[in-house]
Amino acid sequence: VALPHFAAIKSLPLATGLGLSLTIGLLHASKTIAQTISNQEVAQLSAAQSAAPPMDSASAQHLLFVSPMVGNDATADGSQRSPFRTITQALRVAQPNTVILLTPGTYSVDSGEVFPLILKPGVTIQGDPSTQGRGIVLRGGGTFLSPTSAGQNITVLGADQSQLVGVTVTNPNPRGYGVWLESSSPTLTNNTFTHNTHDGISTVGNSAPLIRGNRFNQNGGNGITVFGQSRPEIRENVFEQTGFAINVAEQAAPLIVNNRMSQNKIAVLVQEYARPVLRGNTIENNQQDGVTAIAHGQPDLGTAGDPGNNIFRDNGLDLNADASDQVIPAFGNQWIADRLEGEVDLAGTTNLAQTVSPPATQTLQTVAVIQSGR
């Protein structure tokens, strides 16, 4: 009997630095092959390891398998030969240092999922990172009562030291969010966020996730919203046709590096007291602006000591800071001078330490001044 197909797991984390050979399972459609990997070969997998969860080197990694087509939550043990039917069940039994491997299919209420899916520390949900989760779809949402933002409808709730890798996330419910991060810092890599009616990802509170190598396409509001005092690292993602690609508000200060943002309404919206840092991004063909700053928002687009190296092409305006009361440091970018509005410091000499800070009495539970499409 053919076993359900799971993507090969060469990319799963390996315990390194032990001076020993390591054994991992390479999973294929019909068989499991044991392969011993030398320390030299382990080094060749460093790129894959960067997308893997932290491991406790003293304990073995556990694998759980899920198939919405042939799995069974009532009788299965989560092995490759006897997979669970739902991610919900796999998360119930998962302990730290567990990877939950998903077979292609749609994971929804119809297949037995209970939303939101609540990630756990030290646990990874992995589909197929090589295709950014094509054909492995988490579809649906449920109510989460956010301490900072009231009731929200979300597909996945993040957790510290958790990972979501190689899946497609879609929340078609009204005001639906794909992944919600409430003062948590998971790693989200090589996923696709599409057709979420509000945002692909929302980070609030003191979240500091790594969001890398994902694709955001045709979301109703924003690709990513960054609120509160969040400081996510947003690297090497693609945002296209997705409202505002990145919406930054309150006192958030994300690092936004080497992303491509095209065909959105606005690529990066900066409002309230937000202080994002943008380096090495390509921002092109956005309908209104490449970067918009309003109120006290102050994006750092480059200083004399740290050039921005952002490329702006064919936007309505490359930088629109006309409604911001801040000087915008913007040294070392490629753009058209007559597509810049507001007080822009092209020499990059602005002293960011002397810029406006929010009043001490201001709370962080406000709602963004502008929401795309809302």
Stretches with model-predicted labels:
Residues 111-114, 135, 173-179, 197-204, ...:
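Short glycine/acidic-rich loop motifs that flank beta-strands on beta-rich extracellular proteins
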Residues 153-156, 160-229, 233:
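Right-handed parallel beta-helix
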Residues 102, 124-127, 162-165, 186-189, ...:
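All-beta strand scaffolds that present successive hydrophobic residues in beta-strands
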Residues 87-94, 108-119, 154, 178, ...:
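Short, T/G/N/S-enriched strand-turn elements that build extracellular solenoid repeat scaffolds
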Residues 29-87:
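Right-handed parallel beta-helix/beta-solenoid
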Residues 167, 191, 196, 214, ...:
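Consensus "Asn ladder" position of solenoid repeat domains
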Residues 60-63, 99-100, 110-142:
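Beta-solenoid repeat scaffold
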Residues 122-173, 312-313:
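Right-handed parallel beta-helix/beta-spiral solenoid domain characteristic of secreted/periplasmic
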